[in-house]
Every structure is written in C-alpha cells, then in structure tokens.
Amino acid sequence: GVDVRCEARALRLIVDRHGPGQRIVGLVVREDMTEHHYRAEKGVILCAGGFVMNAEMLERYAPELSRGGTVPIGNPNDTGGGIQMGMSVGGRAINMHEGFLSVPFYPPATLTHGIFVNGQGQRFINEDAYHGRIGCALVKQTFPVYLILNVEDYTDYETASWLQAPVAGTGETLDELAAELKLPEGALAATVNTYNRAVDVQEDSLFHKRGPWLKHLDGPFVALNCTPGDGAFFPYFTLGGLDTTVDGEVLNNEGTIIHGLFAAGRTACGVPRRGDGYAS
C-alpha cells in the first residue's frame, strides 16, 4: 500500500503553527519541475542518510573525521538533507562531531600482537579493541601514527589485509627503527619496554589488552605507516543526527516533541552515537 514516487525531491516541511505547539502536517515535493504539496495525516518520517558526502557539513561539524586521507563511505546522497530539513523546523541535532572511522588492520590476526604508537612514540590504545574504536583514538593523536610489529607477525599482511598501510621502516633494534621513523630519542624503546613488562606478567595495566594478544616485541621490527593521508585505507561515516525519542519522534532544542515529525536511520542520532563505543 505504499505509494513510491521516484525522481521526486522533498524540498521543505509544511508546519501548522496554530495551537499550543507546532505540528508537521505535510511536505513540499518537486516532481517534473513542479512543486506539489502533500498532506501527512499521521506525520513525516525523515530517513535520508547522514552527511558523510557533504564536505561543508563535515568541515563545520566533524573536521576530525576528514583529517586528510580518510575515505567517506555511504550513499552518494548522504548529504545531510534530512538532518537539515529537521533542523529547519527546530529539530535538535546532536553528536554531529561523532563518526565511525575504521582501521581495518586485521586480518591477519597476528598484527594484533603489535602496538600502535603516535608521533611521540607513545602507545595510546589496546590493540585488540574493535577497529572502529581504534580509529576514533587514532585521529586524536599527534601524527604520524605507526603500528610496530615483530617481522614474524607481518606474515601475509600484504595479501590478507585491507589496511594497505605502507612499510615506514625496519630495524634489528628499537633504536634503529626509531631513528628511521624520526621518533623522539628513547621514546619508542621506553614504550616497548613497558609493554614487554606487561607481557611478562600477562597484565596490561595501561590499556587492558587481553592475554591472548600480549606477545613480546623483541625484533627484528617492522613499522607500518598508519597516518591518514599516507596510503592507508581509513573508511568513515557520520553518527550525528536528529535527536529523537525511542519512538523516533524528533525533539526540539528544549527537548520537546515536534508533533508529526519522525526521523530514522542515519538521519537520526540512533543507538550507536559515539565513535569510541560503536560496534557492529
């Protein structure tokens, strides 16, 4: 019983401002170069994706996501039109700075034995975390970012991994590797020594990496360049959107329901609303 209209563009919502509160009562749609007004008996549902394909909105709300070299993924029409339409009638948009950013460094699983370090040679996360959580932490670091591995754990990385991160350096010792990566003197060695002590007692008190993935880094070493923009593949999409009740009713800035207006999908800020907590 659904009347599907193709090649029709929703332009704006129709608002009835009479009475104690505004109500969405319809929609203006352009079809065949002509505007048509449609009455919505029960309401309008905005379900038009996020804004990952809108460079202007990304720059305004989530510049960290598009921080050089990351790759937007989604429908080409994820341009934020539904979110903006809801905002135009007072809908509250929340968590617009949040997004899912993947660091698809496994498979092979052996890469999880390594450690991520930032431009100061410091570790910043447990490497057995969900790849989206790692991505969220990675873009907040001082660049460059490297994944430090034993060469024996490199295995079939070149054929099995989606990451495509280039080799940034190799070394028989940590000092050799750090010099090639131009990291602060002594920083990488201190980080790896701390990590290896955690491996000895099978307890990562800093980031709580689990036992099966705790393995000594004892060389020879290889470093993968995981800096966005330097060759690695980092896909992302947005998580922010219109604030709604559990029934999908859009809320205004005061937290009051806008009657007759609903949002769903990425147009709404749904259950997965933070990059560091997203999982699929």
Task: Give names to the regions the model predicted.
Residues 1-280:
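Residues forming the flavin
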